[in-house]
C-alpha cells in the first residue's frame, strides 16, 4: 500500500503545494493527510469538481506551479468543462495533476450507481485527451508514476491524471479535532426533520449518509418510503432534483435534505 506521508512529500519535491478537490472515500487517508499537513490557505475543499479545476488554474496563473486536484471518478463529468475549455493545451495550457478515485472499477464489487462511471473512466480520460496512469498500489512505484505524470503535465502544459484503485493508500490516523459544541448529530437531525414533516411532503435526500439515515428512520418507524427520493448518485445535485419536482408540482411541498 502507499504511504500517505511519502506520497505527500513526493508532491512537494515536484513543486505541488496547493490542493483542491471534493473528498472521496477511496482517497480518505490521503485527504486526511493533506488536511493535517497543508496550510489552510493551500487546501480548499471545493463546492464541486469543476470549481476545483478552476482553483488549480488560478493557482498556476499566480505562481507558475501545478496544483493537485482530487475527486471521485463520479465527479469527472463536472470537471470536463474547465478541463477542455480552460486547462487544455489548445486553450490556456495549464498543468495540473488529478488524483481520481476509481469507484466501480470493472470486476470490483461496488454499488450500482458506480458501475457505468467506473467502466468509462479510462475512456473518458482518453476522449478528452488527458494523459493518465493507473496508480500502482505500492509506495515506490506510485511515487515514480507521480513524478512521471507531473513531468508530462509541466513539459506539455496540460492536465494529467492518476487513477486510484480501492485500498491503494495505507491507513492514516488523522490528528484529533476539537470536539464539536453542537449537541445534535446528523442522525438525530434527520429523524427530527422527518418526524416533523406533514405526510404530504415529498422529500429529496442527498448522496451518502443522509439518505441512508432517512431510509433507516422510515424503516424503524414503520413508515413507507414512497414519498422519499434517495439520491444515491449525482452528488451535489439533490437540490436541483427537488427544484424540478417542486416546479412540476407547485401544489405539493417539497423538502430537500442536503
Task: Report residues per predicted region.
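Thiamine diphosphate
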Residues: 1-126, 130-253
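Glycine- and Gly-Pro-enriched alpha-helical subdomains that act as flexible
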Residues: 257-258
Amino acid at each position: 500500500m502507499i504511504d500517505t506521508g511519502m506520497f505527500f512529500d513526493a508532491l512537494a519535491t515536484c513543486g505541488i503545494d496547493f490542493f483542491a478537490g471534493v473528498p472521496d472515500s477511496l482517497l480518505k487517508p490521503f485527504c486526511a493527510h493533506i488536511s493535517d499537513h497543508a496550510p489552510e490557505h493551500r487546501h480548499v475543499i471545493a463546492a464541486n469538481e469543476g470549481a476545483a479545476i478552476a482553483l488549480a488554474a488560478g493557482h498556476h496563473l499566480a505562481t507558475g506551479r501545478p496544483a493537485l486536484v482530487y475527486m471521485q471518478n463520479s465527479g469527472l463529468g463536472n470537471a470536463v468543462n474547465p478541463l477542455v475549455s480552460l486547462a487544455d493545451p489548445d486553450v490556456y495550457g495549464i498543468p495540473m495533476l488529478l488524483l481520481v478515485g476509481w469507484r466501480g472499477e470493472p470486476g470490483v464489487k461496488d454499488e450500482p450507481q458506480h458501475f457505468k462511471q467506473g467502466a468509462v473512466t479510462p475512456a473518458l480520460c482518453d476522449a478528452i485527451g488527458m494523459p493518465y496512469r493507473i496508480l500502482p498500489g505500492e509506495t515506490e512505484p506510485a511515487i515514480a508514476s507521480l513524478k512521471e505524470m507531473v513531468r508530462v503535465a509541466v513539459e506539455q502544459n496540460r492536465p494529467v491524471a492518476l487513477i486510484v484503485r480501492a485500498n491503494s493508500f495505507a491507513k492514516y490516523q488523522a490528528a484529533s479535532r476539537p470536539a464539536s459544541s453542537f449537541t445534535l448529530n446528523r442522525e438525530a437531525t434527520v429523524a427530527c426533520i422527518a418526524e416533523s414533516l406533514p405526510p404530504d411532503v415529498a422529500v429529496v435526500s442527498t448522496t451518502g449518509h443522509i439518505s441512508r439515515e432517512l431510509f433507516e428512520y422510515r424503516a424503524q418507524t414503520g413508515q413507507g418510503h414512497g414519498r422519499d427520493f434517495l439520491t444515491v448518485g449525482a452528488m451535489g445535485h439533490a437540490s436541483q432534483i427537488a427544484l424540478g419536482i417542486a416546479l412540476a408540482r407547485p401544489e405539493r411541498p417539497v423538502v430537500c435534505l442536503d
